[in-house]
Every structure is written in C-alpha cells, then in structure tokens.
Swiss-Prot record:
This is 3-deoxy-manno-octulosonate cytidylyltransferase 1. It comes from Burkholderia ambifaria (strain ATCC BAA-244 / DSM 16087 / CCUG 44356 / LMG 19182 / AMMD). Belongs to the KdsB family. It catalyses: 3-deoxy-alpha-D-manno-oct-2-ulosonate + CTP = CMP-3-deoxy-beta-D-manno-octulosonate + diphosphate. Keywords: Cytoplasm, Lipopolysaccharide biosynthesis, Nucleotidyltransferase, Transferase. GO terms for molecular function: 3-deoxy-manno-octulosonate cytidylyltransferase activity. One of its GO terms (cellular component) is cytosol.
C-alpha cells in the first residue's frame, strides 16, 4: 500500500484586486472565498494549511473558521515570492513539499492538489511540479490568455508561453495570419494549470533570483525558475479544472453553486 505524499498547502490571498476588490473575502454560501479554498486544501490531505496575506481582515477571517494564517509583506510581486517568505518564516526542511493553492479557486479538485504534490516527490531532479491538460480547440491554442507548455519525453517543461506552442508549420502557415481559419491541432498541445508544488529549498532561493527577460515578456513567473536552470515536472490530467474567479461575473457564477439546493 502506498502512502500519500506529505505536503503543506499555502494559500496566498491578496486583498487588493483591480477587477474584483476584496476578492478573498467574497461570500460563498456563508463563508469567505479564501476559507472555501482552504477547505479544499484540507480535503486534499495537507498536513498543514496556511493562509498567507498582507491584510489583517483576511487573517481574521481565516482564524475565525479554524485555519492557520500568517501575515506577509505587501510588496510581493508574485504568489511565489509570498510563499518564499512563509517558507523562511517557518524554516521547513529542504525536501518539504509546499503546494501553492491559488486563493481564487474555491472549486479546485482536492485530488489534483494531492497528485501534484506526489508528482514532485516522484521527480527528485525537479524543483517544481505543476499540471497541464490537452487542448483541442484552435481558439484556445491562439488565445494569449491560455498559457501553453511544451514538454519533453519525460513530461518535463521545456517552455511556457502565451504564444501557440508547439507551432505546427505545415498546418498553420497556409492560414496565417487569419487565426479564425486555423485548424484544430493534430498533435498534443497542453494548457498549463496554475497549480504548483515546490521544494522548500527552492522557495528559499527564489527571491534572490533575478527576473528573467522571458518572464517579463510573457508575464509568467515560472519562467524565472527555468531561466536559472531549474526543472519543472508536469502532471498531465485529461480534464480541465474548474475556472477560478477573476471578475464579478465569475463570482456570480460560483456563488450560484454554493446556494442551498444547487448541484
């Protein structure tokens, strides 16, 4: 019998949001969104669930619902930087697996959270694990808001991009630049899922890594790690996860799911 990989779940929760202010505290069936996310992380089997925020109101909401919370600085440029501060505060051992569960994904599948943690443990040569799923629609391939990942033979990431990668020259070039005429991909194309597991030793080094030109160009923080030589193992799942909450319309959609009697 195999035992689940022990891991710690950290939920970065930033109160300031241009599109949806006070997002972590948005009500979902009588509980704040960040608490709903923490419940999912607990269902995944995390040994410890931490909510990390620069806002006292978020910490209070977490503690009111029985979750551990830690105050972090307000000037972090990314969720990974916030996790790095938490890792330094708690002094976790080098091989501790830390999963970054996004604070705006109250419908995240606990099984996926657990599987990404286990995937990192199964790849000792990688500092990070994440997930991706196949996409079959040309509109997704060419959508810059859909992040794609190119993989090697071991499903280790070669590159992440908002551009259509891999580029199928023979299929796409005859139609370029008419994106609407592009055929569906006839080869594997994978959409990145923004769920990460890290080794604590990597988190301690992350803040000292200079930002990479490709990271700044693509606005994808995982490219900083790759730029500095770290490897990212990618777990392939066949199904897309539930979408996170970025806009008032997203919030209304998810709030409806938490109403009594909804399925």
């Amino acid at each position: 019998m195999t035992h689940p990989q022990p891991f710690i779940a950290v939920i970065p929760a930033r109160l300031a949001s241009t599109r949806l202010p006070n997002k972590p505290l948005a009500d979902l069936g009588g509980k704040p969104m960040v608490v709903r996310v923490a419940e999912r992380a607990r269902e995944a089997g995390a040994q410890q669930v931490l909510i990390a925020s620069d806002a006292q109101s978020v910490l209070d909401a977490a503690r009111d619902h029985g979750f551990e919370a830690v105050l972090t600085r307000a000037d972090h440029p990314s969720g990974t930087d916030r996790l790095a501060e938490v890792a330094a505060t708690f002094g976790w051992s080098d091989d501790t697996v830390v999963v970054n569960v996004q604070g705006d994904e109250p419908l995240i599948d606990p099984v996926l959270v657990r599987d990404v943690a286990s995937h990192l443990a199964a790849h000792p040569d990688c500092a990070i694990a994440t997930a991706a799923h196949p996409i079959h629609d040309a509109a997704d391939v060419f959508n810059p808001n859909v992040v794609k990942v190119a993989l090697d033979a071991r499903n280790v990431a070669m590159y992440f991009s908002r551009a259509p990668i891999p580029w199928s020259r023979d299929a796409y070039l005859p139609h370029w630049p008419d994106v609407s005429a592009m055929p569906a991909p006839a080869f594997p194309v994978h959409r990145h899922i923004g769920l990460y597991a890290y080794r604590a030793r990597f988190l301690r080094t992350y803040p000292s890594l200079a930002q990479a030109p490709v990271e700044q160009a693509e606005q994808l923080e995982q490219l900083r790690a790759m730029w500095h030589g770290e490897r990212i193992a990618v777990l392939i799942t066949e199904h897309a996860p539930e979408a996170g909450i970025d806009t008032p319309a997203d919030l209304a959609r998810v709030q409806a799911l938490f109403r009594p009697g909804s399925k």
